């Protein structure tokens, strides 16, 4: 009825209050992935352990491109606006996770022989690379990441619900 009388309510813009340069930088740099999606992907990689050598290039690309930055912004809510339940998100920039993922990348690059000639010299680089050792190293690195995903301190520090992330970072969502 209020609209019939010519009165209009000001629409509340969906955005974070108190958004500043620091928040924008965090959003640009931090990479996040759904906990469920990450767990499923990790399980697939671990199950493919015997074929990891054959698929090293593909897995290397997947690990290198894991998660995304700009997961939230001034006008895009962390985790999205239509959340159902307490969906969990993993921050891939947490020190232990970042180190573990970098170790997987190095192990996969070693499978492909990348950097071998530079490290060992041309003569040693042409020798057999030891596929079983490489596969074992990759499997070990994947197990390290799997262990992190159930580590209590990691879960407290680097796994977030929308509410927890906003609380920890002083973000308050305004709007519907």
Swiss-Prot record:
Its main location: virion. GO terms for cellular component: helical viral capsid. InterPro entries: TMV-like_coat, TMV-like_coat_sf. Keywords: Capsid protein, Helical capsid protein, Virion. It holds the Pfam family TMV_coat. GO terms for molecular function: structural molecule activity. It is found in: Virion. Belongs to the virgaviridae capsid protein family. This is Capsid protein. It comes from Potato mop-top virus (isolate Potato/Sweden/Sw).
